[in-house]
Amino acid sequence: MAIRHLLKLSRRSQQTLATTTRSASTATAVSTASDTRAPAPPPPNQMIYDRLAEQVKSKLKRLEHPDPRFLKHNSPIPAAADHTSLLTYPETRITTLPNGLRVATESNLASKTATVGVWIDAGSRFETDETNGVAHFLEHMIFKGTAKRSVRHLEEEIENMGGHLNAYTSREQTTYYAKVMGEDVPKALDILSDILQNSAFDDRLINRERGVILREMEEVGAQTEEVIFDHLHATAFQHTPLGRTILGPAENIEKITKKDIQEYISTHYSAHRMLTAEFLYDYMLQVISASGAVKHEDVVEQVKKMFTKLSANPITTSQLVEKEPALFTGSEVRMRDDDMPLAQFAVAFNGASWTDPDSVALMVIQAMLGSWNQSAGGGKHMGSILAINEIAESMMAFNTNYKDTGLFGVYAVAKADCLDDVAFAIMQEISKLCYRVGDDDLLRAQNQLITYGRRIPFAELFARIDAVDAATIKRVANRFIFDQDIAIAASGPVKLLPDYNWFRRRTYMLRY
């Protein structure tokens, strides 16, 4: 009797367990079907690093289907990218006048402001040793009054328009530009034409401006980065016009005369040496450029009437460059000063000209190397290596293009006892591009590279950048870096900086 009772209880408990199991299974199925929005939380005994791994996996899944609003131009899903901004960007219109002067405009009538400027292919490269500094001196004197406008009248006219008039000089170009309201564009063009064709160059004001330029030279001399790059050009392009400084030596500034300035204008400020931003680096001409609230036809007619006294000198800058080419010389210059707190140096290779087909690839390489500053936080590729090891204060990859050559390399600032490690890290990152290029690094550099220095349609620019693949990077790196001469400029406590032969060997041998 007792055994029969126990068997009955056993069968009843099994039926209850089966019913409970079926109910739980049904509830689980319903829950799975209705609640798929959030994954179940991890069990309590799961380790912290396991939870982090699950989070990483979740992020990777989201990256496989990114938001199309944030896709880059070279996205793996280009069909989802929005190219409306490229299609609506204002067209660059170019007109060449009978005297050779070129007029370029980008019209955006919805804008209330405009920028008009004159770009001239004239800089320190086209001076002589005796006149070095006259191009920059001319930039200062161009605002010191004309036959019909005194200095005060010129300043008041610009200020009354609420405008901004400025200029700058480089090794190959000089630019004068004005930022004004759209309705004041004719006045701005009149001012630019007046100062470029009718400047008085009063001897009294010339003598006064000498002191201003000499003080400017002292200020530039205190900017160590400017000093490094001036010395880098001087040693890399020694005994060539491109090695001259923009400001010129102090002895030249003290003896430049009105005649020197006028001769420079008549020789280099000719109409056929004015060029649009579209072809600014492909030819040796001069430019009238306007953008914003402007109409192309109106600007062309105004330029025709105003710019009538430009020089007709037939000499082109192409002829000048061919006569005195910038030849790269492997060399170094070191200015040791142990009293300075930090050492800085630049290592440069002979780079590409603006017209070189590999110039875009070098720009991508520059973006791959990146830049970094300790005070600005994290940086890009090589900068992160220097940051992790805390061996540099800052670094910057640079790529400077000229008409027939260029300079490509890295500039760095570091403590004296870290120079050896910094130099090795820099040369390792540069040289390994000849052997190994990561697709991720290449894609990142392409996405960061959005400027070229001259007006190119965005679609063409993106196509040029996207055409650079890993094989192109290695080919260009072997052309410009592998076993090539270098130029070095260094200043500060540079006793521990490796010698020239150490750097030169690491263009072909990656060994500490």
What is each residue range found by the language model?
Residues 100, 107-158, 232, 357-370, ...:
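Active/ligand-binding-proximal structured segments within catalytic/core domains
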Residues 90-91, 114:
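Residue-level marker for the onset of beta-strands and adjacent loop->beta junctions
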Residues 377-378:
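Basic, alpha-helical interaction scaffolds
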Residues 2-76, 90, 96, 107, ...:
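Charge-rich, well-structured scaffold segments of protease-associated domains
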